[in-house]
Amino acid sequence: GGLSQCTPKKPLIAAVDGYALGGGCELALSCDLIVANANAKFGIPEVKRGLAARAGALIRLPRQIPRHVAMELALTGRFITAERGYELGLVNCVSDGAALDLALELAAEIAGNGPLAVAASKRVLVESRLWADAEMWSIQAEILDPVFESDDAREGATAFAEKRAPL
């Protein structure tokens, strides 16, 4: 249970300063975005103790980085640096300072967008990998059509035309 097995509607940002190993790495992997301090390290070293990562890393990691790299990390228990995580697409950005500051900036940028659009975009991104090609456009329309018919969308279009930020 817990955060590693649910998909909240609101975006989750992991701010990693230092080590995210085992459960910490699995918690970060359950987030939508990961920002890290330059000194951060990620890994699932459970195999070194005769265990296996069971809070989602073995499921999520090969969906977020190349399968062979995920296999290497899971089978050896090795760590990767924040920079390597960035190169692999696991980490969104690396900060020289506190990761929390960068995460708060990113959160503020997201919060400045239309909440319905953000929630619907996240839902499509998360759920679409399960959709068959024959149904993907109709399911996406079911989720996104209400966004385009919302007050947020009307205000966004008006603000764009008037060259101002949405209210």
Language-model regions: role of each:
Residues 16, 61, 69-78:
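Short helix- or helix-capping micro-motifs
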Residues 35-40, 82, 91-139, 145-151, ...:
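C-terminal long alpha-helix characteristic of the crotonase
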Residues 23-34, 38-39, 57, 82-84, ...:
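Active-site-proximal glycine-rich helix-loop-beta segment
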Residues 12-13, 20, 34-35, 94:
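Short, well-ordered beta-strand core segments
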Residues 28, 61, 85, 121, ...:
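Terminal peptide-recognition signature
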